[in-house]
Amino acid sequence: MFQLDPLCGHEPLTSGGTIKEENFVKSFWGWNNSALHNPMVRGYFAEFLIYRALLKMDGQRFQVPISHFATRIESDVHDLVFFLDDVKYTIQVKSKDSYSQDQFFKTSLVQGFNYATNTPIKTPSHWSDFYVFAYLQLDEVLCDLVKGFHFEWNKSLVTQTEKNKRIFKQCQDEIVRSVLELDNWSFYIVEQAHLDLKSEISLAQLTTSVSERKACVCNYERLPYMLMRMALLKRARALSC
């Protein structure tokens, strides 16, 4: 949120100004966000990855309004923003993992709002310049094991043996490590116009778009370069009109 500094984790829980527990925020983060493979947390994680990639762009011409994005913005029109010289470019981030039953990314095809006239724009559209679809490859065997244990234990706790709990924990830990491994991530970048007002797009469609040069795909290390390149191309087209 604009001008909200990130917490450091050491903030205490207080009562009447008296400290009741040190480092309470860090404990809360560990309790709330450790399941990095959870779809909601994974989405936040992907957005943060892309924000950090923006900070690696060439600082001579590209700038990120750090004071605005020092903490995540909820329910804003755009997830992220950067500038090429004095021109603003906006980003929408979507994520999906390989184990998701639904292999379609939502594209945020929504109604807009005209702040100049204070009226809604009723025709749905895509409002960001670039859409980054972050795809996470997970181990299907590990995910199946976790899902199977959940299913069995929801029916009966009898099967919750010490051995099974140990296997379950190992699987969970390995899946979390998978989220933190950059080699498991791929990033598809699509310009607004090439979404063709689709409300969702599949991984197969994204792959086709790459082959048709309507999108690009890269690993995390190449992400800053690809975003700079696409912004420069978009700027060049605008100047040539």
Q: What residue ranges belong to the model's regions?
A:
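Nucleic-acid endonuclease domains
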Residues: 1-78, 82-89, 94-241
